[in-house]
Amino acid sequence: TQILFVGDPFQLAPVGHGAPLRDLLAAGVPNGDLKEVRRNAGSIVRGCAAIKAGDRPTLADRFDLDADDPINLRLLESHDALDSVEQVLLAMSRFDPVWQTQILCAVNEKSDLSRAAVNERFQKLLNPEGRRVPGIPFACGDKVICTSNSTLSAVEFGAGDETDAGRYQPTGGESFVANGDIGKVKAISSTGIILEFGERLVRVPKSKPKAKADEGSEGDIVSGAMGDFELGYGITGHKSQGSQWPCVIVLADKSGGSVADRNWWYTTISRAEKACLIVGDRSAFEQQVRRETLTRRKTFLTEL
């Protein structure tokens, strides 16, 4: 049996224990290194290379995205980062501020620049008129992210009000939604929401179905519920790993020091295809981008 592992050992380590890619390389497992960059170009690539080498990247004070060698990595120093991000989003013309742009945060909560703070603010800014129902935290049109692998009922629109989740009928099939998938709230009701993932529509119940007591059944095949989804205007850098967007806004947060290190910044900046804007405290960025934590993880895989 042959096994092929694909990954970047310089990106974020597992949230829990271990550093498997680092240890496999250290153990001398045969490996290759891909050199051609496909996702991005310009100063994003040079900045990531500098971070990887342990150097401080060069950050521009302006963008030039149309140049042959685009200037597409910029730092906007700000004492009120969310105010600055709001101004950027309202003035944005090249990229859709919701679906082509992603805000990345260091921490989930307990910071003015946390994921919770970002989503509370930018839901109001970017989706002020979305239809709401009491008891449901989302509104029609909201950007949401899946936080746990889920199997959900596939649905199709019947007739009537497209924003009413009760107007959607099951197709008889199921649809798998992976942890990290980003979708749009298409319809809403007191019992749940309809989410759109590309051409797929799924029903997300307000609560998980209860197991059936008869016939030894373990319950419905549906495994997801609204608790497995969160607003997605802002997500953490860890949740962003493996994804990409045309424009990425990364918040330089002094409160993110325990999370935002050299590997975190390398990962978040490299999520951007066309433009990456860092907003916030310059000194926090400069300290964090040179701090190493992955190399200090104590593991024993190489000794096995």
Annotate each predicted stretch with a short phrase.
Residues 171-172, 179-304:
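C-terminal accessory regions
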Residues 1, 6-178, 184-186:
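Conserved helicase motor core of P-loop NTPases
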